[in-house]
Amino acid sequence: MIAEEADCDEWDKAQPFAPMWEEYRRIIKPNGCIAIFAGEPFSSALVQSNLKMYRYELIWKKNVATDFLSARRRPMRIHDKIQVFYKKAPVYHPQKTKGEPYDRGWQNRKSELYGEMKRQRSKSENGERFPTSILNFKREYHFHPTQKPVPLLAWLIRTYTDVGDVVLDPFMGSGSTGVACVQEGRQFIGIEREDTYFEVAKRRIEEAQTTERWGSTKTGGAE
């Protein structure tokens, strides 16, 4: 499940967390993951509302900062938070990045699970790196004031789901999560109360489906 901010003003209001979590727990699979985009102070309140399921935080680092009007009074904001919740360990496909091969030799490392010190060799012959909690993706502006970039949503979908899984976005806005699901071969359920944005989302998802079908046809024809 991926939840985007529906509206900047809406998230600034107090949220009825108890009924929200009741529904989320009802519909999520035992090994399902809930990733919620949230700025402060909503983000802190969200985490405190369900410490039992809360696991960790991801940071979306944007390419362009916001809050220019407040730049003389405080640092401009260039990140958003993604809070990750789940009942049991979910599907996890780490999205590795490419780099130069390295061999840092043998090192003593502390196990995060048991706290024991173990001697391990830090080496990568192909230069692959495991992902960190900082995600660098460019902003997208075209359809919604709190629009999330499709590549970022696709990263989350590939990380926490398998091909064919169902992804729910209960605040889908302009449908970026749905577009990412089409691109990544996942099924999608989206909810949006604003008619204007619902129509935008519907159009974008249909266009993505057409593009995927056309691409599949071209690929099949070339074989």
Name the predicted role of every residue range.
Residues 1-200, 223:
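Core catalytic lobe of class I
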Residues 203-223:
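S-adenosyl-L-methionine
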